[in-house]
């Protein structure tokens, strides 16, 4: 007997009968095939050995970290001062039609003498590059600063014939203070400066200019965790001396012949609590008169001068 679908006047609904079987084109078969040899453990991202290898690669890459972006110095006075101070630069931009004066002429001449690219650009292009800041028709491109690694800084300081002398900065946000401290470190025989990676001044063109060229020969390192770095330096035999107005002793009692790292806090905030706890001693600078505190860079210079004096007399 025929089914209902064969009845006269019956309507066959779509999809009630299976259509022809269609193959997968080999997709299912290929999915069952092998995927090749299993990679070594250190190449597998989720394997413990792979995670250790990735961490080691990141640490190696970070030994000479640079800042994130290049810097653009704007204006005739800042540009000529940077070039006079030997701030490293990659390009000098001059807007077409800019009236030349002594500063612009000197900037172009110094850039040419140092092999810095000199590029003439449309004024609107320079406006865009300067984010509409006041550029006076001239701008200098400064590359990111190449920071040392704290481990390398410690190794180089300990390999020197003189006892290690380093400075660490805590809560220092003014690049001019940083530049002045770098200058003092170079002047008094120090081996370098350590900065925290966050909430700290960076080696910008302003800091470089304030250092009067000392930034070219005095390494600056960035520490991911300043407290951990201070502990590491203490374990390596350095005395950690914190400088604070409320110190327990004065700088006269520092043993300057011992390998030392001086930790300098800001004039306003001083040293943070954890940093104070990681210092072997907290010292202050004796002062006459009502002056309560010194600028951070001045205070650092006074302590470094005292340590240098002791070492000269030894």
Curated annotation (Swiss-Prot):
InterPro entries: Alpha/beta_knot_MTases, Ribosomal_eL30-like_sf, rRNA_MeTrfase_TrmH, SpoU_MeTrfase, SpoU_subst-bd, tRNA_m1G_MTases_N. The keyword NADP does not apply. CDD domains: SpoU-like_RlmB (cd18103). Residues 1-70 are annotated as: Disordered. GO terms for biological process: methylation; RNA processing. Its EC number is 2.1.1.-. It holds the Pfam family SpoU_methylase. Keywords: Methyltransferase, S-adenosyl-L-methionine, Transferase. S-adenosyl-L-methionine binds at residues 265, 285, 294. GO terms for cellular component: cytosol. Residues 44-65 have a biased composition (Basic residues). One of its GO terms (molecular function) is RNA binding. Disulfide bonds: none annotated. Signal peptide: none annotated. Belongs to the class IV-like SAM-binding methyltransferase superfamily. RNA methyltransferase TrmH family. This is Uncharacterized tRNA/rRNA methyltransferase Mflv_1447.
């Amino acid at each position: 007997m025929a089914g209902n679908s064969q009845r006269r006047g019956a309507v066959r609904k779509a999809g009630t009968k299976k259509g022809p079987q269609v193959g997968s084109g080999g997709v299912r078969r290929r999915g069952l095939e092998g995927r090749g040899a299993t990679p070594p453990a250190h190449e597998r991202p989720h394997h413990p050995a792979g995670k250790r290898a990735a961490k080691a690669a990141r640490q190696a890459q970070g030994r000479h970290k640079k800042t994130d972006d290049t810097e653009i110095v704007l204006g005739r006075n800042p540009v000529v001062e940077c070039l006079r101070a030997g701030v490293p630069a990659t390009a000098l931009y001059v807007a077409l039609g800019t009236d030349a004066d002594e500063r612009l002429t000197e900037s172009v001449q110094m850039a040419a003498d140092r092999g810095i690219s000199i590029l003439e650009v449309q004024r609107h292009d320079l406006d865009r590059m300067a984010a509409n800041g006041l550029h006076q028709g001239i701008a200098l491109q400064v590359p990111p600063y190449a920071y040392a690694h704290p481990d390398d800084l410690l190794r180089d300081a300990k390999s020197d014939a003189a006892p290690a002398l380093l400075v660490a900065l805590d809560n220092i946000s003014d690049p001019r203070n940083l530049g002045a401290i770098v200058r003092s470190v170079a002047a008094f025989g120090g081996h370098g400066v350590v900065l925290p990676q966050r909430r700290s001044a960076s080696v910008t063109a302003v800091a470089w200019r304030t250092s009067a060229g000392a930034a070219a020969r005095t390494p600056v390192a960035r520490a991911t965790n300043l407290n951990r770095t201070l502990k590491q330096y203490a374990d390596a035999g350095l005395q950690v001396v914190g400088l604070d107005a409320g110190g327990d002793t004065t700088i006269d009692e520092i043993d300057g012949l011992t390998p030392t790292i001086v930790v300098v806090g800001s004039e306003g905030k001083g040293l943070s609590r954890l940093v104070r706890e990681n210092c072997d001693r907290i010292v202050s600078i004796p002062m006459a008169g009502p002056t309560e505190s010194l600028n951070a860079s001045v205070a650092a210079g006074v302590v470094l001068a005292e340590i240098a004096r002791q070492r000269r007399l030894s």
